[in-house]
Amino acid sequence: MKRIFFSLLFRQRRMCLWHILISILFFSSITFSQKQTQKADLVLLNGKIITLDSHNTQGRAIAVKGNRINYVGTNVGVMDYIQQGKTQVIDLQGKPVIPGFNDAHLHFLSGGLSLLRVNLTGCKTKTEIATKLKAKIKNTPKGSWVVGRGWDHTLFNKGQWPDKKFLDQITSFHPVYLTRIDGHVAWVNSLALLEANIDKNTPDPEGGEIVRDALGNPTGILKENAADLVANLIPSPTDGDMQKAIQTAIAEAKKNGITSIQDNSDLNVLPIYNTLAEQGNLTVRVSEWLPFEWIKTPEKVDSLKSAFKERGNLLKLGPFKGYVDGTLGSRTAYLFEPYTDDSTSVGIPQYKQEELDSLITKADKMGYQICFHAIGDKANSMVLTAYQKALETNGRQDARHRIEHAQVLREEDIPLFGKLGVIASMQPTHCTSDKRWAEERLGSERCKEAYAWRSLLVKRAHLAFGTDWPVEPLNPLMGLYAAVTRKDPAGNPSQPSWYWRESISLIEALRAYTIGAAYAEFQDNLKGSLEVVKLADMVVLTKDIFVLPPKEILNTEVEATIFDGQVIYVRPEE
């Protein structure tokens, strides 16, 4: 049975609570009848309201009228907004209330599908992987694709790439396609290679690599654009599959206190979001990104924008997203100097500087917001250079261009974020997941400027945090913990934290997950802080993480999620 946090629990206490309220009102100079127009639909009192306004003000109570906040302040002050029998009054019993989390970077459709497909996240042995694949194959007709994601060779294969032979032993009747945890490498079996006509004579595609053995034969590992040679053969999810995945993802977002997402999914999700919005079932605000390659074909953009029905503050089109490089885990992130553990490689760039400069300048002139995936220091430098050239050519405007991930930076490039107004859109748990092997890939010197949250803030950069789900868990609280401690959930390293000088405070991290993320999508005037007239999206936490040791963040849950002024999630009873 669910915890009746917002219904029976408070109905049972209502008489006692109202005795208290009436006593307070007796000493108040303002009666209920004097301000009828201000009466609230929902009041939360006796709590700790973390507003995240410009002064980081705290309150004890908050009132909501419709889908907007109409009061933040004291328990006494909120009495003017209560109408007995009509206003829902909730005693928070000291629990903190924060703005709803805004996930600035995730893949909502992929996340939902990952919960419905083979999920290899966290598998530490080949036996675990085989067990999950066999369970899926048992219910999959011969000849049909087996698709999954989440494997990480640094967990189960001594850091070495797995190969097709292992998958061939599990099935020779199903083509298998499994993406790595970062989504930038595919592991396939021989049948999948055969279906794609990939053999020793197949050249590497531009921006990709077919990993080969000593004889030149494909091993079953396909990096970056090479993965598309197989991925393009896999039947697309049906409308029903996508709808189920999005509904599953929305349920996950609710329980994690996420009320806004900045989504990098297939644009086929737009009709699904529209339908859910019409039904009143879209309980997360969506900014849907567009492919940067569309900049080359403006007619595609015009066609989509003319057909797309924006739904106010609920559903809108977001920036144009592109990729400059890959990831550290797969050694495809683009670096100035070779990888410490592979002197033959600097990663795989997706653009030459001149092409990137031209495209970004063109997009900026058209007034489009741009965000580019860049992880390696060379990739980040390339994007910053292109943004600077666009500014010099087109003049300064409120573009709010972004770099997604911004994981490895040169010291001289960090000030450019603030100088150019470029948003660093980062995911804190990447730091604590990657630290297991980051020094092996980069060496200690480059790690000093990796995941450099503190340095970026010092140089007046705007931070926007997200989860990158399903690459990392859809849990912003884990991100808060990572940003504050730079430790993994097990508490490692114990002392000191991993390059601890780049850690930030809890309030700074929370701002990046809320008002900072809202700024990154031009909606900081609507949401991201708990202020009068802003949208009533908020989260009640089970513990006061602002006074407890940081490790308690991981033991904290979302007690309730309020979206658009409505309670949409209540934590189940234990």
Question: For each predicted feature, which ranges?
Answer:
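Short beta-strand segments in beta-sandwich/barrel cores
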Residues: 48-50, 67-69, 519, 538-539, ...
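His/Asp/Glu-enriched, well-ordered alpha-helical/loop segment
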Residues: 244, 361-371, 375-401, 405-406, ...
